[in-house]
Regions:
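N-terminal nicking endonuclease/strand-transfer module with a His-rich metal-binding environment
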Residues: 1-214
């Protein structure tokens, strides 16, 4: 999972980029919030002006207030809806989670990798500039933390699903998980299940208790 912070802008040109992708049929607007006065038949210029009006209403001292981010995964590993959940967590942790914060989130279909583009303002609804110190470092830390939590949950779900299958040996159980992309290895009385650098452990006695004897 990669979160890429894209260039800032005075004029919110990221709106033009994403709306052009929509008009080309390779993107769609997944979420719009904080734009209560915008008619659904908006134009890109109206969206850009709404961002500019919002920003300079609360803080006119920031030269490049656009925050533009892309979140992408490998292939179809995550659906756009799952990426949207990750985006919400990311925005919260990076300081953009206020319910009145204007945000546009687009799903893109123009590459082999599912990805989202997020456009918002660096100005919070109370007028302060959202912290950008060590922004790229914090961004990577946040996405790693979110993905660590998510990978643990996915691995746990994969284990539960694998336990629903019929198997007669621990090796057969390992094969079920390996077919889903997990690396499995035994260590003492545990089975270690690894993917994308994240490892969960399960006691082998729990697996053995589910073994089906023919």
């Amino acid at each position: 999972m990669i979160a890429t912070i894209l260039p800032s802008s005075t004029t919110f040109h990221a709106v033009d980029y994403n709306e052009r992708k929509v008009s080309e049929g390779v993107a769609e607007l997944l979420e719009m919030k904080g734009f209560d006065l915008i008619d659904q038949n908006y134009t890109p210029e109206e969206l850009k002006q709404a961002f500019i009006d919002y920003t300079y209403q609360y803080n006119d001292r920031i030269q490049k207030p656009q925050f533009h981010l892309a979140i992408s995964c490998r292939g179809n590993e995550y659906t756009h809806e799952q990426l949207l959940e990750i985006a919400h967590k990311y925005l919260d942790e990076m300081g953009y989670g206020d319910p009145n914060q204007p945000v546009l989130i687009y799903a893109h279909h123009d590459t082999d990798n599912n990805h989202l583009h997020i456009v918002t303002s660096r100005i919070a609804p109370d007028g302060h500039k959202i912290d950008h110190n060590q922004e790229r470092i914090r961004s990577q830390e946040v996405i790693n933390r979110i993905m660590g939590e998510n990978q643990e949950q996915r691995a746990s779900d994969a284990v539960k699903k694998a336990l629903d299958y019929r198997f007669s040996t621990v090796n057969q159980f390992k094969s079920i998980l390996e077919s889903s992309g997990y690396e499995c290895y035994e260590k003492d009385d545990r089975l270690c299940i690894k993917r994308d650098g994240h490892v969960i452990n399960i006691a082998k006695c729990l697996i053995q208790s589910d073994i089906t004897f023919e």
